[in-house]
Amino acid sequence: STYNSYANSLFRDNALALGYEPEAALLTDSSAYQLAKKVVLNFGNELGVQLDEVDLTLKTAIDGVLKLAAELNDNLATGEDVAAVIAELKRQIAAVPTKKEKLAATHADFFAGAFKTEVLVLLAEQYRREKLLQGYVDYSDQVALAERAVREIDSLRDTERELHKIVLLDEYQDTSYLQTSFLRALYADHPVFAVGDPNQSIYGWRGASATNLNEYVETFSTDKAKPVTQLKLSTSWR
């Protein structure tokens, strides 16, 4: 099965323990857009901020919410994490002298962009809450919620490791940080065999990174004294 389909099956088997319904509907792109639009229009008004005040149109706000919500999942981050980073950057930037006019303009651009991101973070978090309230999940939710299930349900890891004595991972260069975190939570220090080609990584647009290959040993082996076999296939037989 694909990484997402495997994660989805684990999520649905344990959905009730996470506060979700096992039959949670998978959002289509069009349904996700409509839900994000509803959040921007309704919750945006509650924030008391006009879109044009943060240099956003309705479409760019919706696109930004969807993109940011997915990125929060893909990086196992929260809106609070992003807000903390922005606050620290603002503190550091504010401490830089602005004697020169060009630098002052750069400061202004940064703070305008930071304010826009802060607004989008609030909207993205509300979008995530709305998905839960309405019984929806999307593709990134499948893996994020499965990873959460592994962390929160003690028996799940042991059950899966007993079921899968040996784990084979294909196209490993196309795994994302989220997928890798999920697989590590389940199978670190378990017999895992992965195949990947850094020259064929094609899913960078959704968070995949060929650097996962370089970090494979550190990801799945915590026992530094135990050797990990690595083989290089220099000839393609396709």
Descriptions of predicted regions:
Residues 177-238:
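Conserved RecA-like helicase ATPase core segment
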Residues 23, 59-168, 179-182, 194, ...:
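Accessory N-terminal region flanking or inserted into the helicase ATPase core
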Residues 2-7, 36-39, 127, 145-150, ...:
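Structural preference for long, well-ordered alpha-helical segments in enzyme cores
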Residues 53-55, 159-162, 224-228:
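Short helix-terminating capping/connector loops at secondary-structure junctions
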Residues 4-5, 30, 154, 176-177, ...:
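Alpha-helix N-cap/helix-start capping motif
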Residues 1-67, 211-215, 219:
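Conserved P-loop NTPase-based nucleic-acid remodeling module centered on helicase motor cores
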Residues 18, 47, 128-131, 202:
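Short amphipathic alpha-helical interaction patches enriched in hydrophobic/aromatic residues
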Residues 12, 41, 132, 151-152, ...:
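Residues at helix-coil transition
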